[in-house]
Amino acid sequence: MVVLPLFFAFFFMVQGNNYQPRDEIPYVRKYFYVGGQYADDGNGDHIFRDQMYVEHLVPTKGPIKQQPIVLLHGQAQTGTNWLNKPDGGRGWASYFIEHGYECYIVDQTSRGRSPWVPENGTIAAIPAETIQRLFTATARYKLWPEAELHTQWPGSGVIGDPIFDAYYASTVQFLKSQIQQETTIQAAGAALLDRIGRPVILVTHSQAGAHGWLVADTRPELVHSIIALEPAGPPFENVIYKGPYSRVWGLTNAPLTYSPAVVDPETEIVKQTIDDRPGSHCIIQADSPPPRQLPNLRRIRTLVVTAEASFHRPTDWCVVRYMEQAGISVDHVQLGDIGIRGNGHMLFLERNSDEIAAVLRRWMEEKDTKPAKKAQEAQGAQGAQEAQGKEKEL
């Protein structure tokens, strides 16, 4: 069935700004769940846990691009990040559908429409003031050198501003355990790629950067490329988010496949600290013994995108350096360096989000020379497969 995205969600909160939304892009929408398993509830009955909600959006005339896009949101967010923006504007799902891509949008396990049960572990929420400081009003707080360059968030970015309130109302609880979140996403994400059955483009944001590496590590043959928007980092430590030693596997908290193999990352991954950039150190692998490689990620084309004013600006270079050291071919686009100014961590929700999406699209398409006909044939084969499954059409 053809539907129009509900871009009027929260519209009552922003109508005082006289925002005039553009017409949305029509698409065919389906949803389904992947992963998970039955578990004993402790009373002799069973519950289903660790499943992941997936929303599948397809251009009404069918996709004309070879690879589907799988969009993975960050911490305290849901898949609504990719639909419409809190100011009422079109989101990235509409942008990519308009350009011929089919999109799969997930809610992380134990998040949003992916049910949480007590057995999944303790949950937490991000206070509005933290969102202001790190995402939406960074110029007010100046917690890192580039923070004052932030100009692209619509509105003031603080409590009481209707656009901020609309955005903050969309944030949700999340699992406190990063390992629990990563391992359940890894399993559910692998199940999603198995269901799609052909190589995809993973677009990850923030916390989901780790999820993308893990899913690709599990199903490298089903990942065409990865676009990591300000991925979780830097390796082995937290900088802005102060806390305990983190990402003991370098890019993740959960195990990755290294060569030579690693059992105990804290002792087997030998580290060094470098200070290649003023005011920003970086922990990477030591030069001796030779750095361990990430063989399942080496063949996957990867793009890391960093916004000019984000708290990732001082540290994303370190993530890229670690990846290169582990044998991954990675492109790093710093938006400020190509004339896209003023963006923060939530760059896909900001005023110039389409301009940034165009950068991603050009990168995707310059590497993809396969004819569109094959995409349509693959879509037809997938449709026949889905008709036999439990997918529910809205």
Swiss-Prot record:
Q: Where is this region: Disordered?
A: 366-394
According to its UniProt record, the EC number is: 3.1.1.1
Q: Which residues form the signal peptide?
A: 1-16
Provide this UniProt record's keywords sorted from A to Z: Glycoprotein, Hydrolase, Lipid degradation, Lipid metabolism, Secreted, Serine esterase, Signal
Regions of biased composition (Low complexity) lie at 377-387
- Which GO biological process categories is it annotated with? lipid catabolic process
List the molecular function annotations (GO) for this entry: carboxylesterase activity
Residue spans of biased composition, Basic and acidic residues class? 366-376
Q: Which family does it belong to?
A: Belongs to the AB hydrolase superfamily.
Q: What name is this protein filed under?
A: Probable secreted lipase ARB_00047
The organism of origin for this protein: Arthroderma benhamiae (strain ATCC MYA-4681 / CBS 112371)
Upper taxonomic lineage:
Eukaryota, Fungi, Dikarya, Ascomycota, Pezizomycotina
